[in-house]
Amino acid sequence: MINIDPPSGDYPASGGSSTHYIVSESESRLAFKVKSSNNESYRVRPVYGFVDAKGKAKLEVNRLAGPAKEDKLVIQYAEVPADETDPKAPFAAGAQQGEVVVKMVAS
């Protein structure tokens, strides 16, 4: 239901940033949640949000300086009604429908 563009992130170990887009292939509005395998090195904004039907949402990723290694972001998503105002609500209710893994490499 979603794709990530670009589908991976490459950063110098000294740190860096990138912009990714969560692109919806769904006919419905989606809520998303971003999880990281390395919260010490990565900062992601927004962590929760919405993507309109067939729309896209901007995701800013910052990699802080640290040891070179591979990590991942997991972007979970769930369909939500058009009038939903809290992007955290479907995940608190266990309504997750799928997820996409984004490989993050610092070298």
UniProtKB/Swiss-Prot annotation:
PROSITE patterns: MSP. Gene3D superfamilies: Immunoglobulins. Residues 1-107 form the MSP domain. It comes from the Eukaryota. InterPro entries: Ig-like_fold (IPR013783), MSP_dom (IPR000535), PapD-like_sf (IPR008962), Sperm-specific_class_P (IPR051774). Coiled coil: none annotated. Expressed at higher level in testis. This is Sperm-specific class P protein 31. The gene is ssp-31.
